[in-house]
Amino acid sequence: MDRLVDRDISASMFTATSHDPLPTHVRTVVVGGGIIGASIAYHLSAAGENDTLLLESNVLGSGTSWHAAGLVTGARGTTTMTKLAKYGLDFYSRLEQMSGLDVSFQRCGSLSVARTAGRVDELLYAKDVADQQGVRTEWLTEDRYKELWPLATYSGVAGALLLPDDGHINPGHATVALAKLAHSLGTQIRENVAVHKVLRQGDLVVGVLTDQGIVHCDRVILACGLWTRDLAATAGVKVPLYAAEHIHVRSAEIDGAVPELPVYRDLDNSYYIRHEAGRLLVGAFEPDGLPRPVEEIPSNGFAEFGPEWEHFAPIRAKAEGVVPALASAGFDRFLNAPESFTPDANFAVGETSELSNLFVAAGFNSQGIIFAPGIGKELAEWVISGTPGFDSSAVDVQRFSGHQNNRNYLKARTKEGLGRLYAMHWPNLQMETGRNVRRTPLHARLAELGACFGEVNGGERANWYGAPGTSPTYDYSYGRPNWFDRVAEEHKAAREGVVLFDLSPFAKFEVAGPDALEVCQMAATADIDVETDKAVYTLFLNDRAGIELDGTITRLGLDRFLVVTPSFTQQKTAAYLKRIARGKAAAVFDCTAALATIGVMGPKSRELLSRISPEDWSDEAQRYTHGRMVEIADGYAYSLRVSFVGELGYELYPSADMAVNVLDALWEAGQDLGLKLAGYHALDSLRSEKGFRHLGHDIGPIDDPYSAGLRFTISMDKPGGFLGKDALLKLDPTAPDHRTVYVALEDPDPVFVHDETVYCNGLPVGRMTSGSYGHTLGRAVGIAALEPDADLSGDFEVQCKGRLYPAKVSRRPFYDPKGERLRG
């Protein structure tokens, strides 16, 4: 594993320019000369943005790129990630020809091994997604496995998946090749220039302070790996990531270690193996990682830690058990170097919430080589156009909560994060470290009543309930998990009786001031100039008419509005509203922590509320989508008659200090009504049956309202327009780029995850964007995006873990298509 210390292949490229004075102004500064920064610089220049300066504090590739194993693949676990990975794999196959440099790209394939039934399910699911996106796959027989990897035993193998077009590349050489391409298209590159600070004026970046002076610019892109967090902090921006040790060892020479060996991923044993010059390289993604604070990592390039043979011993023993030649050959090199990890094991990409012209691309969780080309391309487009051209929901840096940037929290989470790459990616998987940091006002009481909590972006929420007095835990499955029956009971109670949801994690903002209406009108596609206490469901678009957010806006008064959006969009919602409010006589207040939210849902919700409140709860007193302040329990709360479950329901907004009082009163009063507590898994099941969209799955920044089937949210004629209207006017509402439909399997046994391929008359025509088990319908149900010309009268099937299941497809939800139950 050669370091690029001698710089042979780059010396002729940059000698002529590396000693020139820094420019005083450029359009774009990219900070970080690793493979991510080089890819961004190349893709910017390839798109015509050649007034770009790439700054590297040492030499190109000397941060973390140099020591990466260089594994590349065309498949990941979701459609979006597979598209990004596939682009990267195709790009690397052309990089040598494009750049004229040897990047040692070896297309040897990759072999992923399953040793448990659950892992077999995961690989079959991944195979379905790969097949859907045109990535070649092969499910291996024992004989084929032995043919491809004669050095490995077959003992304990439950299944194996081959991706024949995968391979590996020299990451240092690839970094320099990308930089050469960028340089040839006009990008300026400076090595040995340290950036000390990102400079800002108000809410905008204006330049960077380096050890060689100030460079003024119109925008900055931070792609400096594990140093991104601290550099962003110089401008008051939070980018949560933390370093951990990543270990690989190299064997002595082994007979049979040939270049044709596929990359071997033993996922259940937490290691990979690849060929290297007649030897085998073994790398670990152990479940008990070793976090390292950035202060302990040298900033002068090519940082390494000392050997950790004792820590590596369990992985080594497993690898030697599978490949006995490793034990007999021994190892002649131990490499231990830093990688950076985020709290949820997805990378941090995009425009920051704090500064509208500061972008980041960091925290790649040991997948930077795989995703560098794809993210370079997509972020370049994002920077140029101002909006993402891909579904960025899972990687958008704005998804994180502010407290997740805390170093104590990050250190605890990173110990787990390293191993998450090879750990099981179960549906609804919950992180285990860094928990119980951010809780709702009802958390303790719900724990007493049997809640099993999950976490979204650092916040705890009740996902399902065991019996009161128990401490339920997760037992995951790609089929029916251990909470399936409990959620079925919660679901039934919501449909037939009454349930309580703790919806306090919802992001909540008050917009107030003389220009508050103007701000909300510009933010929302719907007309918000409505009567006081009227709630409106709306979309929030970007400049391309893509859906950035969805939620409700309730008019509280002449110049006061309550905006409620999904919990994971708290930072994004704040940024969206504040940017529109900039320069206007309106303030945006985050009241998420100040207000609890209790969902009282089900046909008996009206009866329950009347027992603890003297108010009139009739339909005439509070109509659907209307709110009011009510006297309830021993205090007051704002009551909003809306429901995400498809039944009569109310959202109560007591102040945080009164929330437990309201919950206790409801719980005590509802026992003879069969009242149950319900969690977010039941909420997902209920909304799937009703066909309500889920932001981040069914709708996102590349989906316009027409394609999403949400045309009813648009008010083209309201005064002043709205953000994204100009782009929306250019679209033909009768010719969307895809068709959103509702899907239900005929077989009652399978369970949807998402991204399953949908077939019509034997041909693939789309994919499931989200799904759950519809306990009222007694089958898996969800939402799909189909090709616009798909024949809805055809015979439909959905592929689940390699098997096709007959399905029904409809333009209208299968449950209560007219929405009569909502209106009570």
Curated annotation (Swiss-Prot):
Top-level division of the source organism's lineage: Bacteria
Organism for this UniProt entry: Paenarthrobacter nicotinovorans (Arthrobacter nicotinovorans)
EC number: 1.5.3.19
Requisite cofactors: FAD
Gene that encodes it: abo
Induction: Is transcribed only in the presence of nicotine under the control of the transcriptional activator PmfR. Forms part of an operon with purU, folD, nepA and nepB.
Modified residues (Pros-8alpha-FAD histidine): H67
Family named by the database record: Belongs to the GcvT family.
UniProt-listed GO biological process terms: nicotine catabolic process
Name under which the protein is recorded: 4-methylaminobutanoate oxidase (formaldehyde-forming)
InterPro entries (UniProt xref): FAD-dep_OxRdtase, FAD/NAD-bd_sf, FAO_M, GCST_C, GCV_T_N, GcvT/YgfZ/DmdA, GcvT/YgfZ_C, TrmE/GcvT_dom1
Keywords: FAD, Flavoprotein, Oxidoreductase, Plasmid
SUPFAM superfamilies in UniProt: Aminomethyltransferase beta-barrel domain, FAD-linked reductases, C-terminal domain, FAD/NAD(P)-binding domain, Folate-binding domain
Pfam families the record matches: DAO, FAO_M, GCV_T, GCV_T_C
Single GO MF annotation: 4-methylaminobutyrate oxidase (demethylating) activity
